[in-house]
């Protein structure tokens, strides 16, 4: 029996770009890791290129390296731990080893508590020592003000305050970086916080102009890691010349799959000349309990169903990606929706589909919309100065024990005060927002557990638990999944159309978000043909199918290449066709959180979108011809 748990932003679209030969996660991190704010333990030097090359030769995964780095661990300690434990151990073993190094360093340190406190906040050690000498070790507020003030800060531009970091409805979404130099906005010459961010970016190797423009563009609420995302993406795209020169249209690369589709004589529309803009608010054709509901749209005759199709991917992609996706899916514009209107967590996604949009309804019971509703036990410990009511997007990795310890260390000196100083509050809130931390005790912020993520995303309790799936795999699979309540709202229109059941072709199924949505809508699944490369994910769907007593047939393929045109036609002949083709190609090459291989639809994973198009074309041709 399935138990439902009812109790409880990657900021700018970058022009299409080509991946750099020097684009492994290890190399990219070496370029910018040394002075990241909030690093767990200061290091004397970075891993050498030879050392990181050795890690690759040992067979260590770039993706795991990137995950460990994003959790706040220094590159030197990651490299040391990998060499000690070997490349093939669980990520948790490597984390435990790094934690041991951290404890040893702290035990042998002779630095004062004040120095440790501000080093943990990411300030430069030399400046911390100087500030303590000037103001005294006990005057923490004066030390903080000194560290946050510098001559450069007096001449740096202030950030523009915008909702969620960036106002996506701005008219300059599609403009180039030259616009940043021509802003007429009023500048605050005394932005100490922004000055600190810019100094950190300069130490990481960016120019002062690049850093200040990034801060101005991304907004004052953006943390250092997200600013680095923006700058690294632009550098890898070789687009920094656009800070200074007029934009020149570049011809995108076309891989074999793209040429295959574009060589069929499909007309090229003006969509490339009119970039798709992300709406604010991101509510698509409407969401429950919000104004602005749209109940009618026009679709090209060729695009109308049945069969129906539903394609999902991340909203914040490199520039030009959604135009390309739309062009290959009958010129249908995407419906952009942020799942914060359906649950407690944000999740900005784009959906291209040919479903009706009238008479949508929400599955019951509705999810929890606020943090305190979703986590009622946290309310007792929630500081008044933490004003969050929503969580950010669910990530594929989670905050480390060292991070939560740094937060505890930062707060404990102020236990007898009404609240900590503003600079401590800012640091803690930044980390809580980045890693979706919730308060579980006094000075104790903790990352979400997998079962809590399942509830937020609309899955049944224990959906990903057991069956050979590790915690790391659970985080990754949940972070890449559908938000079930959002998808179910869109698919709800199918219930009256298929009262006796539906045949589904599910591509890149993951942990079965689409299937869970249909089940919760009480739409009978007569047939599901699923394509999913991960064995543990396939097992999760199979377990769900059995536990919910589905009477239809589940057929699973492990590789999209196995679903040949002949195979598809054979399945359609046997089962009578498909009513819905649902899926979303792997988005690792599109997601803003991916600093290294964010290469748009040219990426090895994201190019699988063209396989979605191939299969949809076969299904539609067969059903239209029958």
Swiss-Prot record:
The keyword DNA-binding applies. InterPro entries: C5_MeTfrase, SAM-dependent_MTases_sf, SAM_MeTfrase_DRM, UBA, UBA-like_sf. Residues 160-196, 245-282 are annotated as: Disordered. Changing residue 587 to A: Loss of function in maintaining non-CpG methylation. Keywords: DNA-binding, Methyltransferase, Nucleus, Repeat, S-adenosyl-L-methionine, Transferase. Residues 295-626 form the SAM-dependent MTase DRM-type domain. Residues 160-187 have a biased composition (Acidic residues). It catalyses: a 2'-deoxycytidine in DNA + S-adenosyl-L-methionine = a 5-methyl-2'-deoxycytidine in DNA + S-adenosyl-L-homocysteine + H(+). Its EC number is 2.1.1.37. One of its GO terms (molecular function) is DNA-methyltransferase activity. Changing residue 585 to A: Loss of function in maintaining non-CpG methylation. It holds the Pfam family DNA_methylase. It is found in: Nucleus, Nucleoplasm. SMART domains: UBA. It comes from the Eukaryota. Its main location: nucleus. One of its GO terms (cellular component) is nucleus. Residues 262-276 have a biased composition (Basic and acidic residues). Gene3D superfamilies: DNA helicase RuvA subunit, C-terminal domain, Vaccinia Virus protein VP39. Expressed in roots, inflorescences and at lower levels in leaves. Interacts with RDM1. Belongs to the class I-like SAM-binding methyltransferase superfamily. DRM-methyltransferase family. Involved in de novo DNA methylation. Controls asymmetric and CpNpG methylation. Required for FWA gene silencing but not for the maintenance of SUP gene silencing. Functionally redundant to CMT3 to maintain non-CpG methylation. Involved in RNA-directed DNA methylation (RdDM). Acts as major DNA methyltransferase in the RdDM pathway, and is essential for RNA-directed de novo DNA methylation of cytosines in all sequence contexts. Associates with long non-coding RNA (lncRNA) produced by RNA polymerase V (Pol V). DRM2 is expressed at much higher levels than DRM1, which is scarcely detected, suggesting that DRM2 is the predominant de novo methylase. This is DNA (cytosine-5)-methyltransferase DRM2. The gene is DRM2.
